[in-house]
Amino acid sequence: QMPTFTHAITNTLKVGFLVGILSTLIGLLFAYVEVYVRMGKFTGGLFKVVSMLPVVSPPFVLSLSMIMLFGKAGIITRFLLKIYDNSVYGFWGIAIVQTLTFFPVCYMMLKGLLKNIDPSLEEAARDMGASRWKVFTSVTFPLLLPGLGNAFLVTFIESIADFANPMIIGGSYDTLATTIYLQITGAYDKAGAAAMAVVLLCITLAMFAVQKYYLERKTAATLTGKASRGRMLITDRSVRVPLTVLCSLVALFVIMMYICVPIGACFPTWGYKFFPLTGKWFKLVFTRYHGFQAFRDSFILSLISAPITALLSMIISYLVVKRK
């Protein structure tokens, strides 16, 4: 149906652009704090762990946690705030969950770029009387611009191609990935689904072309290799405290989301009866719900795909580097 398809395209682009921007900003925040700000050992380690959690966890865990915490029967909305008609499904639910899922990608990309910026350039600007904000906007940011574009591109593509999160928390908010799936399973229209998939591919290729053309016209060149000297970390409280507070808020929210799932699995009935804690759901998963078979199949597929992926990545990277 053309109206549904065009609506799904619009929804997908809206979510993709917002998630790309938010993920890039949060990733830049965590990367900047790690590279430039002097942090305590515990705080710095906590931020590193939090920024890597979404990478190693299943993609739908945050969606499930969002529903369990902020849904109509959520702990925070219903039992703490006494809000009984709150709905997390739709545009904002997808955007929040995807942002928390994909910002670690931006963090890892931007952290490497920040470490490769020569500190002598920034210190020279400081010696000439520039403020830290002026140094960031006139020296650091121009050098980061290609990396920011790449980070936005990657998260945008991952957002519009994401299926698990919109399927769980999207509700009636259609995206291209879920529309393609429903076109196959619901309408039994494989040709139509293939056409939609081509459109999705064209969108990602168009974004890549625009980003590449835009960045290639920039005159700023990113620095690669080792910095000429060590970087003096920021100890000024006027800079350190606000950045630490922002990172702490994101970190606490992510930790709360991940704690919710294992604890919620021990509740007798979610949303109504929380005590006494029970392990019956784990027993049912592996006895009645074919959980052991699903676990075995997933483990076997991982063992098969991991070495193949590693081998192909090594071959492709070798050819790309050696052909230059």
Q: How would you name each of these model-derived features?
A:
Residues 113-114, 138, 166-169, 182-183, ...:
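Short alpha-helical segment immediately N-terminal to, or the first helix within
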Residues 128-129, 142:
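Glycine/proline-centered hinge or cleavage motifs at structural transition points of membrane proteins
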Residues 1-115, 143-163, 193-212, 239-269, ...:
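Membrane-water interface segments at the C-terminal ends of transmembrane alpha-helices
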Residues 68, 162-187, 271-275:
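Glycine-rich helix-loop "coupling/hinge" segments at transmembrane-helix boundaries
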Residues 121, 130-132, 163, 190:
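Membrane-helix interface/capping residues of multi-pass secondary transporters
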Residues 209-246:
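Alpha-helical transmembrane segments of integral membrane proteins
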Residues 1, 277-286:
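A short amphipathic helical element positioned immediately N-terminal to and/or at the very start
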Residues 104, 123-124, 134:
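Internal catalytic domains of large membrane-associated glycosyltransferases
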